[in-house]
Every structure is written in structure tokens, then in C-alpha cells.
């Protein structure tokens, strides 16, 4: 960030917007060190932000200010980043870390609801790829599904399935994946 400011007199989001990069659909990763102006630019340009909590934690990069990005109108998604900065590409783990890091950073146990977190990982992820036909359970949407075994000890008790998905589910709980109605794994 500092190098971009020194070279171009602007933060990376402002500089890239001025170059026209955000005139096409864009997803920006991490976005840990945004200014208010950066958030305004990203929101105005409709840039999605992929939060990568495990990568940010491993590299000591900081915690993305989800609250400020949401307030600015930025649509958030979830990412795992690459193998150099996250050795475990486990979306369940990253979803869990995103929830915990935001709650710890905000000192607020309800800063992101389980339902909101699931939307970040599913619906918003699909939208960031231009896929309006998936990422949600709705008549007419593609049947892209992941089914989990909820009879494991760590998934009990089931008071709220959304909470269990965020705070208890593991990749090993997946018993079925389906893409556009075709079962790929069972």
C-alpha cells in the first residue's frame, strides 16, 4: 500500500479505479488496509471483496474491517487464497475463522450472523462470478448442493443448523456434492 502511495500518490484501489480496472467485473482479495475513500471507490464500482481470513492470519496481515465494508455497501465473499499463504483450502475452516476474527475484532458476539456468513460464502460467491443462477436454494436456481452428515458428535446438539454449519462443520462431514443436479461425490 505504502509503495503504491509513494509511486502514484494514491492507494491501490483508487489507483486501479483511475486506470479503469474496475470498469469490468472485479473481485479484490484481502482488502485489509482500506481507507474510507478506498471503500467508497470499491462500493461505487461494484467491486466484490473476497475475505481470506486464514491467509491473513497466517501472514499476520491483519483483520479485514468487514463492518466498515458492509457499511460502505461492498458485497463480501469468502476466499482461501493460495498455497503459499494458506496450506489448508478448507472453506469450512475459513468461514469459521471469518466469524471468530470478526467477533473478536468487533468485541461483539453477533457482529455477523450465521445466516449472513453463509450468504457471504454461497450467494455472494456466486454473484462475484457472475453466476446469478446458483448460490441459493430457490425454485429455478441450479441444483448446486453440498450435503453434510449431521449425526457426528461435533455437530450435536443441533439447535440452529446455520450456527452448526459455521462453528462445527468440517470438510470430512461432506457426504454428497451435486452440481446442476448431477451428483459428483457420494
Q: Would you name each region that the model predicts?
A:
Residues 53-57, 82-84:
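Short, acidic/turn-prone active-site loops that include or flank metal/cofactor-
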Residues 31-35, 55, 132:
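Short beta->alpha connector loops
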Residues 58-63, 87-89:
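Short, charged, surface-exposed secondary-structure boundary motifs
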Residues 1-48, 60-76:
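Histidine/acidic residue-rich metal-binding segments in metalloenzymes
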Residues 18-21, 25, 67-152, 160, ...:
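His/Asp/Glu-enriched, well-ordered alpha-helical/loop segment
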Residues 177:
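Short aromatic-centered micro-motifs
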